[in-house]
Amino acid sequence: MKKIWLPILTALAFTTPAAAQEPQPRPDQLIFRDIFKELIETNTTLSSGSCTLAAERMATRMKAAGFPDSQLHLFATPEHPKEGGLVAIYPGTSKKAKPILVMAHIDVVEAKRADWERDPFTLFEENGYFYGRGTLDVKSQAAVWVDMLIRFQQAGYKPKRTIKMALTCGEETNGAFNGVEWLAANRRDLIDAEFALNEGGGGDSDGKGKVIGQSVQVGEKTFANFRLETRNPGGHSSAPVPDNAIYELAAALTRIEEHEFPVELTDVTRRYFAEAGAARGDATGRAMIALALDPADKAAEAIVNADPFLHSNLRTTCVATLLDGGHAANALPQRAGANINCRIFPGHSIESIKDELARVIGDPKVTITQLPPKRPAPPAPPLDPKVIGPMERLVAKYWPGLTVIPSMANGYTDATFLGAAGIPTYGIPGMWGDPDGNGVHGLNERIAVQSLYVGRDFMVDLVKAYAD
């Protein structure tokens, strides 16, 4: 999951190199582009691709650049031979400074050639954009990390901190083998770090080449799927009875639809609403500031709730996503069921949300069962000045006038597993997306050429700021 672009600014816009005529790529950018191209053109979907092959290809490049086998760790399990990954270790000079971990998932969402304007597994460059599945989510980040370590190796760079890189599979598919989860449970030594840099942050553009905001993801919601089910004896449809499984389920779903979880704020979301609201300068922005000051302000809440992202960022949400019922057109239903997908605000257990659903439904005939996978719900990482400070300084350098706004994701990433393992994980600023979402998880996914190249420079500078 790449960042769901936050509605940070609307009134202000800051020109970046993307707003100008496309410059000719530098020689180092062309080398990087080749790595990016190879990753995009290696199909890593769960159905027909191989993360293992992509990881092996990156390891081959790194070995050719001088990395010894002892610093390259390919991994896969016998049960999931195509869902492997790569951990690379670039040693630092200090024995006291803890390592940093840079990470990216290399699996991608399914993409059907018939639905796309171009082959999703061929890299195309057109009209200032790169097109292909994974261009923004998130093989761009994986390519940056591989290219960065290769350049460090070739230049003989000697950081104080050891830099670790993890390219993993399984982030995009619920229930699939997850490389970060496996590493945390089985090879913690390979990824142990003071903190990790992940996807989830990033910038917003106005869609015309102007970057209008940069954020760092600090924490995310966890999720749970619940199966609601009702059962009745059934019978012939010519003789309806009061107890009808479909009607009972429909009543339960209506109660969930009408239920609004209360407004809540963490330190991160309070700061997000205050700072992003101040930057907007419109009615929604003023309401955001008011809510940051007083979460009980109902008038402000009503204005903010009109934005689906902001509404969800304030609370737990539960929504029906799948529905089934009945067994024959001329029979009373014996069973009806629905999936309820909940995105749970930090500080709440999954069990407490299940109990809340039962209370809202108020019908003991409706059973509620949590479905796999079951993910951990770690606390948000701290707003550590040692982590946030370098981001702020570099954002000010690259995009004068912009600040880094901390945010909480309504979705989730592999940071869940690292956070549960005690490694604070941050979704970094840098690359930016357009207001329409750039086709992430959808058709014709793309990233602006300058978003990739400028974001790459920013990300490498950020790692060096931490490593030095």
Where in the sequence are the language-model features?
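Bacterial N-terminal signal peptides
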Residues: 5-16
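Solvent-exposed, acidic/flexible segments
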Residues: 25-33, 44-55, 81, 135-138, ...
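Acidic/His- and Gly-rich active-site-bordering loop/insert found
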Residues: 22-133, 142, 152-161, 340
